[in-house]
């Protein structure tokens, strides 16, 4: 859909390897094209990221980014329960809360080619509910 910069994948992988990291997530919001995301989705991303940081005690700028890389062995160190929209925020929560060597780096984000696949309210509410219920995993 051309939103994420595929040409940056080698850079993100090199960053992971060269810095001896376990997980790298990408922040789209700081380098986003003006027409890449509706105002409603920008507000939703801000709210979900705020909730992720508040409820889970981490500090990231883009909890909803779907561009991330990780070492294969990370899978055995995280407890992933979602197979839907919350997977992205869950993976970040798990990586940062479980003490993995994890960082967030900025990447460009472009306007989608084709239709937006998000159901704004349903997906947003589901992700928010997931953030609340995920807190039980770290009590």
Where are the model-predicted features located?
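Short, hydrophobic alpha-helical packing/hinge segments within bilobed ligand-binding/sensory domains
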Residues: 66, 91-92
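Short-chain dehydrogenase/reductase
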Residues: 88
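Acceptor/aglycone-binding surface of glycosyltransferases and processive sugar-polymer synthases
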Residues: 6-85, 111-128, 132
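Catalytic donor-sugar/metal-binding loop of nucleotide-sugar-dependent glycosyltransferases
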Residues: 58-59, 80-83, 92-110
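The conserved acidic donor/metal-binding loop of glycosyltransferases
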Residues: 1-3
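A charged, well-structured terminal subsegment
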Residues: 138-139
């Amino acid at each position: 859909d051309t939103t994420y910069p595929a040409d940056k994948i080698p850079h993100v992988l090199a960053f992971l390897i060269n810095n001896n990291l376990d997980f790298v997530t990408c922040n789209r919001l700081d380098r986003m094209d003006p027409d890449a995301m509706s105002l409603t989705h920008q507000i939703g991303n801000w709210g979900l990221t705020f909730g992720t940081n508040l409820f889970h005690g981490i500090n990231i700028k883009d909890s909803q980014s779907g561009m991330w890389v990780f070492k294969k062995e990370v899978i055995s160190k995280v407890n992933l329960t979602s197979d839907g929209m919350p997977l992205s925020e869950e993976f970040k929560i798990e990586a940062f809360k479980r003490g993995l060597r994890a960082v967030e780096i900025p990447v460009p984000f472009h306007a989608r080619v084709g239709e937006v696949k998000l159901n704004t309210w349903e997906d947003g509410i589901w992700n928010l509910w997931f953030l609340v219920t995920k807190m039980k995993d770290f009590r």
